[in-house]
Amino acid sequence: MDTDSQRSHLSSFTMKLMDKFHSPKIKRTPSKKGKPAEVSVKIPEKPVNKEATDRFLPEGYPLPLDLEQQAVEFMSTSAVASRSQRQKNLSWLEEKEKEVVSALRYFKTIVDKMAIDKKVLEMLPGSASKVLEAILPLVQNDPRIQHSSALSSCYSRVYQSLANLIRWSDQVMLEGVNSEDKEMVTTVKGVIKAVLDGVKELVRLTIEKQGRPSPTSPVKPSSPASKPDGPAELPLTDREVEILNKTTGMSQSTELLPDATDEEVAPPKPPLPGIRVVDNSPPPALPPKKRQSAPSPTRVAVVAPMSRATSGSSLPVGINRQDFDVDCYAQRRLSGGSHSYGGESPRLSPCSSIGKLSKSDEQLSSLDRDSGQCSRNTSCETLDHYDPDYEFLQQDLSNADQIPQQTAWNLSPLPESLGESGSPFLGPPFQLPLGGHPQPDGPLAPGQQTDTPPALPEKKRRSAASQTADGSGCRVSYERHPSQYDNISGEDLQSTAPIPSVPYAPFAAILPFQHGGSSAPVEFVGDFTAPESTGDPEKPPPLPEKKNKHMLAYMQLLEDYSEPQPSMFYQTPQNEHIYQQKNKLLMEVYGFSDSFSGVDSVQELAPPPALPPKQRQLEPPAGKDGHPRDPSAVSGVPGKDSRDGSERAPKSPDALESAQSEEEVDELSLIDHNEIMSRLTLKQEGDDGPDVRGGSGDILLVHATETDRKDLVLYCEAFLTTYRTFISPEELIKKLQYRYEKFSPFADTFKKRVSKNTFFVLVRVVDELCLVELTEEILKLLMELVFRLVCNGELSLARVLRKNILDKVDQKKLLRCATSSQPLAARGVAARPGTLHDFHSHEIAEQLTLLDAELFYKIEIPEVLLWAKEQNEEKSPNLTQFTEHFNNMSYWVRSIIMLQEKAQDRERLLLKFIKIMKHLRKLNNFNSYLAILSALDSAPIRRLEWQKQTSEGLAEYCTLIDSSSSFRAYRAALSEVEPPCIPYLGLILQDLTFVHLGNPDYIDGKVNFSKRWQQFNILDSMRCFQQAHYDMRRNDDIINFFNDFSDHLAEEALWELSLKIKPRNITRRKTDREEKT
């Protein structure tokens, strides 16, 4: 009996503890005349039936008393963890909001500094990317709360304002800006303010949504009156009384009623779920951007816990302090955030809040009279229109000192702060009602805070600006593109995504530059504009002719080129695993790692739909929604008939009929692997070459987008390497964009993966563009795609694509400035520090290799392919530079030898170069090896008298370039080397030319992919060698001695010296090699 009495006593004490923890919930229980139960009320209990307990519980199982104690401890621990997690989330939000404000302040600083320093303009695109990267974590915050319509609408506004900011910076990058245009300054301030308003609203709503479950999920406790009767409980011990007294502080601190003394009056009704009404608290202010919508009731739910006060217990105090700190930040967020980033806000009780609220009118009037100065001791929390984060919009940051010294748009970390002024910004946040326009920034009078800005004057300026822009060919209006958060169906969104049909622009038109005026616009990237013909159009042609001489001289070693066997170029590359690793790495870098799976992963995701009949059924409505059958009619996306004449010319009448019969199905919309394979021409059994022998350009593209199939890695690489031979990069980008936008709006997992794989191919196409291919049209096309991605909320994809674009623009700018930053040795003004004998042969070989490698790694694969097709060195600048370096080195070697007056000196130098060639062979540098060999074996040097041992040694080295069996010796040596290696590109160019001239581009109207596979195989070794780099130190003494090989004689001068040393009428002994030839 003592055991039962003790157990009943402990159970009663536990219930008292639980009542203390849940006392606020008891007080919320509606009761018309009853009072909340007093703490000292004795709660009777049923005696514990020990026999029943032993019957149903196994031996050693915790008794119900232990379970109750564990429940109390678990509830306390979970409350601490929940509040701690909430505090972490709010601190994280506060930190990310700081980063956005810092990024916007940095962007504004760059804009302000453009007026006084044109070089700062180069940092503008990078600063816009910083804003994008700062906002990206906020929109990826908590997927569980993104189902809210309020948050979805807020996301859409953030995306649209961010897209406008990025578009403005991109247009400035392309077209320049008139820095003295006042309307431009006002416009960009409105764009920045719109982004900041959207982010502020997003953070506020996120706090409300995250804070709702904790304070607004009441668990209805059982009423004390409903508890069964039982024997009187034992008196409490001193320790138990002390514990109960300590819990009193927490029960009072967690009280949610506005008046702590008024506990007898219960509310007439229980509060609605998720809504709390706090009496005598200041009403929440309406968000300026949502005038037409009702204020969110959740604002009060976050402000209400501000009435909690601290008390004395250890564990309850810890819980209360965490919750109090969280709610202090929530109160500052909802009341304007004046102390979000500095200082500690005074802790307010409901009564003190009322008292301070009564003083807010006087303080507001004093703020209006005193230029917005506000002391931290006043209740700035109650002013909805004050936020120090907006101060930088009213400041002139052109004199800010903390500008990072970075080149172009280097995405380096942001500066901590650029300084804040003491004059706060008074007025409502930037407001853009539906179809409205931004107001000019500046302090507003109290009467103007709720007035709607006049739309008619803004529309007049907008129309005039549009006329000006239309006349100049610049697009300045911003459309609102459909978003995934709009209340429209997936099919409607899919049909409107590529072609926006919104008749109005909710954001103001942004003018990146102003035509006319007194001040000239700041130029930025002049390479993207069409060159003006200032002279006679007959003058440019001779320049490529001169460069062709260098290319022909480079390939003189291959005068006896014989046709190799076609099977030589059909072999499967041995570096397939390298391409697989590269593909997987790129997917991880770009964020597509989840798309890389096994061979049959596509079929496992979803059953293949019957696409051909489905497409015929959807054709008529698709045309109404803006998707015609031919993708060429969609915003310039080319169809099958938009290719150049070289494709249409070989087509036979039968091929044309078959092509017309296939036009019923849009091949760019196919997603079934079996359907795709049925439209490809596959190889027959026993044939050499790739599995895919041909197909239309569209179906080859669609097949290349199946990047999640490991068996197609080599095919994708071959397509990306050779697509320029049958379609231009601009046309390919348009087709990929069309395919991506066709499937991206769908929520279906399989179609989402198709769109993701398509975008991955598009990013790779952009990443592998040559600098000469980066035209203004392609840049505008890609920047428009970035704008669409941001509007649709695809910030991660937009970030990846934008980074690639800016990297390409940066490389082109550096290439333009390369000639002006060359060292003195490259300009031919450095003096030679000695002779060739002053340096060791292996040291000279290493420095020759470093110079070759620097130029070799700059060559882009498409340059080599385009030269073999078009013989146009203007499109292959890096290849041209590499070949000129080879020729200059060869003539430099000839000149050094021929300028020696004594035969012994000439012999000594020739032996020196033979030793250098030996070390070059060990370094696998075939380029410099053959450059020196071509010099020593040239006619002006070979005709002179040499020692027999020297001539025989030189002949041994010449066997490497023996032309018999299509240069079998060199091909064998090249296949045996291990990277790093610098090959002789002359043979690669000759092979590509042979394949191009010996195979048709099209067979029966379809792209001959077998030809492209041969070209890919030829370029495979070069691509592999470019991946491995040399690890050697640069020796400036030797580099300066080379002097960029600019000090050499022309071929005519070399012949004159050779004839002077040995006239024609003097015979000499022929070597064994000469007798054979």
UniProtKB/Swiss-Prot annotation:
<keyword id="KW-0344">Guanine-nucleotide releasing factor</keyword>
<feature type="modified residue" description="Phosphotyrosine; by HCK">
    <location>
        <position position="504"/>
    </location>
</feature>
<feature type="domain" description="N-terminal Ras-GEF">
    <location>
        <begin position="688"/>
        <end position="810"/>
    </location>
</feature>
<dbReference type="InterPro" id="IPR008937">
    <property type="entry name" value="Ras-like_GEF"/>
</dbReference>
<dbReference type="InterPro" id="IPR023578">
    <property type="entry name" value="Ras_GEF_dom_sf"/>
</dbReference>
<feature type="modified residue" description="Phosphoserine">
    <location>
        <position position="360"/>
    </location>
</feature>
<feature type="short sequence motif" description="SH3-binding">
    <location>
        <begin position="606"/>
        <end position="617"/>
    </location>
</feature>
<dbReference type="GO" id="GO:0010976">
    <property type="term" value="P:positive regulation of neuron projection development"/>
</dbReference>
<comment type="function">
    <text>Guanine nucleotide-releasing protein that binds to SH3 domain of CRK and GRB2/ASH. Transduces signals from CRK to activate RAS. Involved in cell branching and adhesion mediated by BCAR1-CRK-RAPGEF1 signaling and activation of RAP1. Plays a role in the establishment of basal endothelial barrier function. Plays a role in nerve growth factor (NGF)-induced sustained activation of Rap1 and neurite outgrowth.</text>
</comment>
<feature type="modified residue" description="Phosphoserine">
    <location>
        <position position="335"/>
    </location>
</feature>
<keyword id="KW-0524">Neurogenesis</keyword>
<dbReference type="Pfam" id="PF00618">
    <property type="entry name" value="RasGEF_N"/>
</dbReference>
<dbReference type="GO" id="GO:0043547">
    <property type="term" value="P:positive regulation of GTPase activity"/>
</dbReference>
<feature type="short sequence motif" description="SH3-binding">
    <location>
        <begin position="281"/>
        <end position="292"/>
    </location>
</feature>
<dbReference type="GO" id="GO:0005085">
    <property type="term" value="F:guanyl-nucleotide exchange factor activity"/>
</dbReference>
<dbReference type="GO" id="GO:0005769">
    <property type="term" value="C:early endosome"/>
</dbReference>
<keyword id="KW-0729">SH3-binding</keyword>
<keyword id="KW-0967">Endosome</keyword>
<feature type="modified residue" description="Phosphoserine">
    <location>
        <position position="314"/>
    </location>
</feature>
<dbReference type="GO" id="GO:0005737">
    <property type="term" value="C:cytoplasm"/>
</dbReference>
<feature type="domain" description="Ras-GEF">
    <location>
        <begin position="840"/>
        <end position="1064"/>
    </location>
</feature>
<dbReference type="GO" id="GO:0007169">
    <property type="term" value="P:cell surface receptor protein tyrosine kinase signaling pathway"/>
</dbReference>
<feature type="compositionally biased region" description="Low complexity">
    <location>
        <begin position="213"/>
        <end position="228"/>
    </location>
</feature>
<feature type="region of interest" description="Disordered">
    <location>
        <begin position="248"/>
        <end position="300"/>
    </location>
</feature>
<feature type="short sequence motif" description="SH3-binding">
    <location>
        <begin position="538"/>
        <end position="549"/>
    </location>
</feature>
<feature type="compositionally biased region" description="Acidic residues">
    <location>
        <begin position="660"/>
        <end position="669"/>
    </location>
</feature>
<keyword id="KW-1017">Isopeptide bond</keyword>
<comment type="subunit">
    <text>Interacts with HCK (via SH3-binding sites). Interacts with CRK (via SH3-binding sites).</text>
</comment>
<feature type="compositionally biased region" description="Polar residues">
    <location>
        <begin position="484"/>
        <end position="494"/>
    </location>
</feature>
<feature type="compositionally biased region" description="Basic and acidic residues">
    <location>
        <begin position="358"/>
        <end position="371"/>
    </location>
</feature>
<dbReference type="GO" id="GO:0007265">
    <property type="term" value="P:Ras protein signal transduction"/>
</dbReference>
<dbReference type="GO" id="GO:0061028">
    <property type="term" value="P:establishment of endothelial barrier"/>
</dbReference>
<feature type="region of interest" description="Disordered">
    <location>
        <begin position="411"/>
        <end position="494"/>
    </location>
</feature>
<dbReference type="GO" id="GO:0007399">
    <property type="term" value="P:nervous system development"/>
</dbReference>
<keyword id="KW-0832">Ubl conjugation</keyword>
<dbReference type="InterPro" id="IPR001895">
    <property type="entry name" value="RASGEF_cat_dom"/>
</dbReference>
<feature type="short sequence motif" description="SH3-binding">
    <location>
        <begin position="451"/>
        <end position="462"/>
    </location>
</feature>
<feature type="modified residue" description="Phosphoserine">
    <location>
        <position position="281"/>
    </location>
</feature>
<dbReference type="GO" id="GO:0032486">
    <property type="term" value="P:Rap protein signal transduction"/>
</dbReference>
<dbReference type="InterPro" id="IPR000651">
    <property type="entry name" value="Ras-like_Gua-exchang_fac_N"/>
</dbReference>
<dbReference type="GO" id="GO:1990090">
    <property type="term" value="P:cellular response to nerve growth factor stimulus"/>
</dbReference>
<dbReference type="GO" id="GO:0071320">
    <property type="term" value="P:cellular response to cAMP"/>
</dbReference>
